[in-house]
UniProtKB/Swiss-Prot annotation:
First and last residue of the signal peptide: 1-15
Subcellular location(s) of the protein: Membrane
Listed name of the protein: Testis-expressed protein 51
Transmembrane segments: 138-154
Keywords: Membrane, Signal, Transmembrane, Transmembrane helix
GO CC terms: membrane
Bilayer topology: Single-pass type I membrane protein
Taxonomic source organism: Homo sapiens (Human)
Superkingdom of origin: Eukaryota
């Protein structure tokens, strides 16, 4: 914590300090201090995701319990009923998981430039943020160009230019 406070108090190189562009700094420091002082409670978003999982699990076990109560005597029907509830539970979890993945894919990241405090919202499709996508495109273009050049070179040697000299 002491190094963070020293960084905050010392001026940055060339008189520009990135921390002046960071309005959420006090909230983040407060959260870090809560973690250091072992104050209970996870972040709200994590607890909401956990609540979703616990709620779906509770529904599943309640349905299984009801099936056991009603179909206790017929074990084959009971196993089929439990298997059906298991499949429904899995489908609901997969649906929630797909929704979270889609939300994450479409999300943007807020990036602040220290030089002028301008805020940029970047996504993974942005070449500034994920340059690996552009490399794949350039690799594809280089491969295609090489294949075309080899095809042209091969075509020249087989078309008869070499035969005319003989």
């Amino acid at each position: 914590m002491l190094p963070l406070l020293i960084i905050c108090l010392l001026p940055a190189i060339e008189g520009k300090n990135c921390l002046r562009c960071w309005p959420e700094l006090s909230a983040l420091i407060d959260y870090d201090l809560q973690i250091l002082w072992v104050t209970p409670g996870p972040p709200t978003e994590l607890s909401q995701n956990r609540d979703h999982l616990e709620e779906e699990t509770a529904k599943f076990f309640t349905q299984v319990h009801q099936a056991i109560k009603t179909l206790r005597d017929d074990k084959t029907v009971l196993l089929e009923e439990i298997y059906t509830h298991k499949n429904l539970f899995t489908e609901r979890l997969n649906k929630i998981s797909d929704g979270l993945k889609e939300k994450d894919i479409q999300s943007t990241l807020k990036v602040t430039s220290c030089a002028d405090c301008r805020t940029h919202f970047l996504s993974c499709n942005d070449p500034t943020f994920c340059p690996a996508r552009n490399r794949r495109t350039s690799l594809w273009a280089v491969s295609l160009s090489s294949a075309l050049l080899l095809a042209i070179a091969g075509d020249v040697s087989f078309t008869g230019k070499g035969r005319r000299r003989q």
